[in-house]
Structure formats: C-alpha cells, structure tokens
C-alpha cells in the first residue's frame, strides 16, 4: 500500500484504486480514463456477476434455484466473447448478487485478482469496503437516478439496441433498492472514500477532480 505521508509519490509503484457506485453512475467511463492516465489495469467486478447470469441463462438455471446458482458460481469461466452488457443480464446479475454464498465465491476471485495485480483500478459496488479495503485510493461515484437512466439509454442507443427510457429508470431504481438492502455487502461508500456526485459533471471533470485529489492527498 502507498504511504500516504510520502512527499514524493511515484506512480510507477504499486497502486490500487477502488471505484464504487450504483448502476450507470459513470464508473465505467471514469475508470477507463483513469486506468489509461495512470497506466493501471482496469477491471469491472460486475463482469463476474454478469458472466454467472449469462451462464444461468445458457444452462437454463432459474435464479430462484439458489443451490444450482451457488454450484455454478464455483465454476466461473470468463473466457467467452458474448455480449454481457444487455439490461436483461444486468437485472439477473443484480438478483443473484444478493445470494451470500455466491458473493463469497466470486469475491475470492476478485480479491485474488487485486492481490496479484500490482497496478489496478477495480470498479464495482463493494470494492472499497470488501474486495480492496486497503486500496490506496477509494472513490465512490453517484448520480441522480433519472440522469443515470438517461446515460444508460444513450449508451444502448449508440450500440444500436432497442430500449425504453422509463423501463431503464425502473430497473435502475429496482437495482438501487436491491443493492442497498441486501444483507451481503450492501452498496455504501467506504468511510474514507472520496464521494463524487456526477449528476452535473462530465467524465473528464470527474477525472480532473480525482487527479487533483491524488496530487493533494497522496503527494
């Protein structure tokens, strides 16, 4: 872990950033820009849940069959070329993420990835509180649900996908409720996280704020 008291911070050394927040808050775009700026490996923790959701669909496993979902979570394989970003998969991923045993199994994969990667920014819901509590920098991104729904709508439209704004908003509100109320690692910022509301900010403006924070606090 980086010594926060050092006066000459060297970005060539080991460095871990946790980037948490609700769905469609802008984490992905911000994380990718930060990863490029500071030469970090970028990883979305949601991919492991989306992969499991895809596997459930592919193997015709009902998400209410908890034992079957738990068993499948022990055999995770991320090596595929399928599109995991559609809203149906995201909704199922949110449902299975509330299963404690599933989170425990997938968290082992994520924790090991953080420990074995020297320079990484990991994005998710509980990275700063569960996966990487010793991260050098913890950031929590949030935004108004309506703004987030509009962002997701534009993203999907840009990919040529058919979508309905009201339905996206409904799903975001539902996922927020599920994420915040789940017993296993509910969505909340770490006590020492930098919290940024991106409702009125562009991704570049958020990156600038984080960069200034790093320069002021970590150097």
Swiss-Prot record:
BP terms from Gene Ontology: pyrimidine nucleotide metabolic process
Group of enzyme by EC: transferase
CDD domains: CMPK
Its EC number(s): 2.7.4.25
Catalytic reaction equation(s): CMP + ATP = CDP + ADP; dCMP + ATP = dCDP + ADP
ATP-binding is among the record's keywords: yes
Origin superkingdom: Bacteria
Cross-referenced InterPro entries: Cytidylate_kin, Cytidylate_kinase_dom, P-loop_NTPase
TM ranges: none
Gene Ontology terms for molecular function: ATP binding; CMP kinase activity; dCMP kinase activity
Coiled coil: none
GO terms under cellular component: cytoplasm
UniProt-annotated location(s): Cytoplasm
Main location: cytoplasm
Binding site for ATP: 21-29
SUPFAM superfamilies: P-loop containing nucleoside triphosphate hydrolases
Keyword Kinase: yes
Keywords: ATP-binding, Cytoplasm, Kinase, Nucleotide-binding, Transferase
Family of the protein in this entry: Belongs to the cytidylate kinase family. Type 1 subfamily.
Protein's name according to its UniProt entry: Cytidylate kinase
Organism: Rickettsia felis (strain ATCC VR-1525 / URRWXCal2)
Phylogenetic classification of the source organism: Bacteria, Pseudomonadati, Pseudomonadota, Alphaproteobacteria, Rickettsiales
UniProt gene name: cmk
């Amino acid at each position: 872990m980086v010594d926060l008291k050092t006066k000459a911070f060297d970005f060539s050394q080991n460095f871990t950033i946790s980037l948490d927040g609700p769905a469609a808050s802008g984490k992905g775009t911000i994380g990718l820009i930060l990863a490029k700026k500071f030469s970090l490996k970028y990883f979305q923790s949601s991919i492991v849940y989306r992969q499991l959701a895809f596997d459930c669909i592919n193997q015709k496993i009902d998400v209410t069959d908890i034992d079957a979902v738990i068993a499948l979570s022990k055999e995770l394989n991320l090596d595929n070329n399928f599109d995991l970003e559609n809203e149906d998969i995201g909704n199922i991923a949110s449902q299975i993420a509330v299963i404690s045993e599933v989170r425990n199994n997938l968290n082992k994969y994520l924790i090991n990835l953080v420990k074995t990667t020297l320079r990484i920014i990991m994005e998710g819901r509980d990275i700063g509180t569960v996966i990487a509590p010793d991260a050098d920098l913890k950031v929590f991104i949030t935004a108004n649900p309506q703004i987030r729904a509009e962002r997701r709508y534009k993203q999907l439209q840009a990919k040529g996908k058919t979508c309905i704004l009201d339905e996206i908003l409904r799903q975001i509100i539902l996922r927020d409720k599920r994420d915040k109320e789940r017993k296993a690692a509910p969505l909340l910022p770490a006590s020492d996280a930098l919290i940024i509301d991106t409702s009125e900010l562009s991704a570049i403006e958020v990156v600038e704020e984080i960069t200034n924070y790093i320069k002021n606090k970590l150097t």
